[in-house]
């Protein structure tokens, strides 16, 4: 039986979205506590119950920690960017928590991780959005990331 693996950075991105979601939902600003909770979940594959038997999940701990720390360090700038991309009829206070968490992490990686090509960031987070958000929100994520990439001259 062959072993299947998912890219470690892809898992780190999902885990970072989960950590930031937890931060927002629990109003918990203890970054180390949040990171430890999420890491312990991923380090114990037994806690993930609906995986195929031969699928191995592991994440890039360094990429995960870098993403979460960068979001915490830049949270006000990230929220300002997100809010500036909302249409006039959208109230930032009513943005779904999961959408805000995904946008915080994805925009953070787009802006503060110059080693990751913009196209990769956009594709990865659009794929993550496909698994977590509704169709309208997926399009919004793709549109916002594309605009930010172009605004910051990291052309695709």
Curated annotation (Swiss-Prot):
A cellular component term, taken from the record's GO annotations: cytosol
HAMAP family: NusB (MF_00073)
Superkingdom of the source species: Bacteria
Family the UniProt entry places it in: Belongs to the NusB family.
Keywords: RNA-binding, Transcription, Transcription antitermination, Transcription regulation
Function in brief: Involved in transcription antitermination. Required for transcription of ribosomal RNA (rRNA) genes. Binds specifically to the boxA antiterminator sequence of the ribosomal RNA (rrn) operons.
MF (Gene Ontology): RNA binding
Cysteines engaged in disulfide bonds, as pairs: none
Name under which the protein is recorded: Transcription antitermination protein NusB
Gene: nusB
One Pfam match: NusB
InterPro entries, alphabetized: NusB-like_sf, NusB_fam, NusB_RsmB_TIM44
GO biological process: DNA-templated transcription termination; transcription antitermination
